[in-house]
């Protein structure tokens, strides 16, 4: 069926090319032609979808077709076209259609928008492009959140796939580039509910002219304000989106939180299943987990700068 569809579309395109040819049609040549293709991915494997898309783009570039309209649910197709060529139709409410125009959202006269557009375009692949088709999105910083969130949801008797919720790994704190696409305060944005999960990552810097922020433990936060300046990550974002109509920022507890991995270990401090053979201090951690007394645990710790900081914080 896929090849039959291609043959049929090729015949239609050949006729359109002939109809627009002055040499062939003389004065009857059609000067304005549009091509509309619905669900071109039907029965076509990804490589053939790319090939067909390239064929259409070549026809437009050569002037055989003035404009091409294509409807698609293919992530391969979406990831292969430019952002300015996309129009995203969503239905946040039954009977209501929202139209999103990425080419309008990212303004060419704004340097920040240009940088964001370039990043999003590089980021999109056949997997990430699924964000245009999901009903709701959860943006996360890394692979741990991407893998574990669906598992945590199942423990709560929720299935993210059934709810059409997609977890998107940003590979870092690059939320701002993508939030422009979905910020409903801006016209022509794509209307979806967005959650951004980010690590609170407490940090501190010495009160010196050339001081730089460095990561610190939650129990070290604000204990030496005379010599250090402290801050948490995402304070601005959490406040900025607290009352936003479709975007929210969430992070760990201010008192105890640091990262997802840190919190998992803190809540399951005697669970050896969390340890892998690649951990450099595997024996040390297993020995500490075997103890129930804090002082005995500290006695199993190796001498290092990080462990000294931990012991000092516990003692104080």
Where are these predicted regions, by residue range?
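Switch/communication elements of ASCE P-loop NTPase nucleotide-binding domains
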Residues: 1-127, 146
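Acidic, divalent-metal-binding catalytic cores of TOPRIM
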Residues: 91-316
């Amino acid at each position: 069926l896929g090849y039959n569809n291609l043959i049929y579309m090729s015949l239609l395109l050949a006729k359109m090319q002939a109809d627009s040819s002055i040499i062939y049609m003389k004065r009857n040549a059609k000067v304005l032609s549009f091509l509309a293709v619905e669900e071109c991915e039907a029965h076509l494997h990804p490589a053939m979808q790319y090939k067909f898309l390239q064929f259409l783009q070549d026809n437009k570039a050569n002037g055989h077709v003035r404009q091409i309209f294509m409807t698609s649910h293919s992530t391969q197709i979406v990831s292969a076209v430019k952002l300015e060529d996309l129009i995203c139709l969503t239905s946040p409410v039954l009977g209501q259609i929202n139209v999103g125009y990425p080419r309008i959202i990212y303004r060419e006269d704004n340097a920040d928008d240009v940088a964001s557009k370039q990043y999003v375009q590089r980021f999109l692949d056949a997997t990430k492009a699924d964000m245009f088709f999901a009903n709701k999105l959860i943006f996360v910083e890394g692979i741990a959140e991407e893998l574990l969130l669906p598992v945590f949801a199942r423990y709560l008797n929720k299935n993210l796939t059934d709810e059409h919720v997609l977890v998107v790994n940003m590979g870092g704190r690059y939320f701002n580039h993508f939030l422009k696409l979905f910020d409903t305060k801006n016209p022509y944005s794509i209307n979806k509910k967005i959650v951004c999960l980010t690590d609170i990552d407490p940090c501190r810097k010495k009160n010196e002219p050339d001081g730089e922020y460095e990561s610190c433990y939650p129990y070290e936060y604000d204990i030496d304000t005379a010599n250090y300046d402290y801050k948490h990550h995402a304070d601005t974002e959490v406040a900025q989106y607290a009352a936003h109509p479709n975007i929210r920022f969430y992070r760990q507890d201010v008192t105890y939180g640091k990262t997802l991995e840190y919190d998992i270990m803190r809540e399951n401090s005697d669970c050896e299943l969390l340890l892998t053979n690649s951990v450099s201090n595997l024996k040390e951690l297993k020995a500490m987990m075997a103890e129930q007394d804090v002082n005995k645990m500290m006695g199993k710790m190796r001498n290092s700068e990080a462990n000294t900081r931990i012991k000092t914080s516990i003692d104080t």
